[in-house]
């Protein structure tokens, strides 16, 4: 026991409230702990005055003690490290307590997973912990990939689309919190920020009106008029513009070719479509893998099955931030002649997932009755997580039989 501890614990009765026993930090053996005690006593005395120590005084004394412990060369390294971390946390807490109300609300209303303010829907578990829509869907998708029950990262209660509900009060409160424009750095309510950044901000990034003839300029809106007055593209010769336009037309041609192909397929004699429901299953391997399969369905008087896999059945898809789905079409019935088909998958009538149409072709025979795995053309990993978070994946399959 140090001299400070002996004086604090075994001395005579304490003096008036707010005073410090005279023996604190005095006597043989008083070292760095005594300095911490004196600093704490000073903080308590200044904050509380003649009355009892208030909360601010106690917090200040605690922070000074932690700083002294962190700087004590005789303390064990682990203790110094813990004290330094605790001092930083105490300083952050003190700073947060003295900030504006909206700044303190950020930590109250933020998502418990990404620690950011939700941009759209806010979900809560049965104990009230908040999750933004993106993180909520991602938790459900990860649980599906790992064959586990999804749980709240805070309280570990079970979460699902049926157990969790939206918190409209938090959504409205977040929409009224001020947020900084990324261009002009002014503060606006979050509900008005998107409109400001798209239509009103003078510093928003915009494009030249001559981009249709190849001008690549991007810049702030308040410089647009000056640039367009000096833009060189309107004065280019016809041959120069033709070279630029040829490159711009290539992507447009590919898109038009795709839609023309779809229109041509719609004129075929034998066309079939059906709603398909991919259901999750697990392989029988030692390390199971998630895959999806539909019940058998009949289209064009034939029996079919669809299968799908995540990230091409990689070992740990839950460790990857990029999520993809690929699928294959299997013919389950026997055919007397080769069956040449075109097929494509689109979103179902009640889903909001974004899928780009891609046409695939295959000739089915009794010996070759399944296609290779082909990519499901989902826009990005966020849309893929939406599908994985659902109990089942509902899509619409179109089949076109090619007759010769």
Curated annotation (Swiss-Prot):
InterPro entries for the chain: Sina-like_RING, ZFTRAF1, Znf_RING, Znf_RING/FYVE/PHD, Znf_TRAF
- Family annotation (Pfam families): Sina_RING
Principal location: cytoplasm
- What GO molecular function terms would the record report? zinc ion binding
* Gene3D superfamilies listed in its UniProt record: Zinc/RING finger domain, C3HC4 (zinc finger) (3.30.40.10)
The annotated regions of Gly residues compositional bias extend over 1-13
| Keyword Cytoplasm applies | yes
Q: Can you supply one Gene Ontology CC term for this chain's record? A: nuclear envelope
Q: Which UniProt keywords apply?
A: Cytoplasm, Metal-binding, Zinc, Zinc-finger
Family to which the UniProt record says this protein belongs: Belongs to the ZFTRAF1 family.
Subunit text: Interacts with LGALS3.
Q: What is this protein called?
A: Zinc finger TRAF-type-containing protein 1
What gene does the UniProt entry assign to this protein?
Answer: ZFTRAF1
């Amino acid at each position: 026991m140090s001299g400070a501890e002996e004086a604090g614990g075994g001395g005579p009765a304490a003096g008036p409230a707010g005073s410090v026993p005279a023996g604190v930090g005095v006597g043989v053996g008083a070292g760095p702990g005594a300095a911490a005690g004196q600093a704490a006593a000073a903080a308590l005395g200044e904050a509380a005055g003649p009355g009892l120590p208030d909360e601010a005084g106690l917090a200040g004394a605690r922070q000074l003690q932690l700083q002294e412990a962190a700087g004590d060369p005789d303390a064990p390294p682990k203790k110094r490290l813990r004290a330094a971390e605790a001092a930083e946390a105490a300083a952050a807490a003190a700073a947060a307590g003295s900030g504006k109300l909206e700044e303190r609300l950020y930590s109250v209303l933020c998502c418990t997973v990404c620690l950011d303010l939700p941009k759209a829907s806010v979900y809560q578990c049965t104990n009230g912990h908040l999750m933004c829509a993106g993180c909520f869907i991602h938790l459900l998708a990860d649980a599906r990939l790992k064959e586990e029950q999804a749980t709240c990262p805070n309280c570990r209660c079970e979460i699902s689309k049926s157990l969790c509900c939206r918190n409209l009060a938090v959504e409205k409160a977040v929409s009224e919190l001020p947020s900084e424009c990324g261009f002009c750095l002014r503060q606006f309510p979050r509900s008005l920020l998107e409109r400001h950044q798209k239509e009103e901000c003078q510093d928003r990034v915009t494009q030249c009106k001559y981009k249709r003839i190849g001008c690549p300029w991007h810049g702030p809106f308040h410089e647009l008029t000056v640039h367009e007055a000096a833009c060189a593209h309107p004065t280019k010769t016809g041959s120069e513009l033709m070279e630029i336009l040829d490159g711009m037309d290539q992507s447009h041609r590919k898109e038009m070719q795709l839609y023309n192909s779809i229109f041509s397929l719609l004129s075929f004699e034998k066309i079939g479509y059906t709603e398909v429901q991919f259901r999750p299953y697990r392989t029988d391997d030692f390390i199971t893998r998630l895959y999806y399969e539909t019940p058998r369905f009949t289209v064009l008087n034939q029996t079919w099955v669809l299968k799908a896999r995540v990230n091409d059945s990689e070992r740990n898809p839950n460790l990857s931030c990029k999520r993809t789905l690929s699928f294959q079409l299997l013919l389950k019935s026997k055919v007397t002649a080769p069956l040449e088909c075109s097929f494509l998958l689109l979103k179902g009538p009640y889903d909001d997932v974004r899928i780009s149409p891609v046409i695939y072709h295959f000739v089915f025979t009794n010996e070759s009755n399944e296609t290779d795995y082909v990519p499901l053309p989902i826009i990005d990993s966020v849309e893929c997580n939406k599908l994985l978070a659902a109990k089942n994946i509902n899509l619409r399959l179109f089949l076109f039989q090619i007759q010769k």
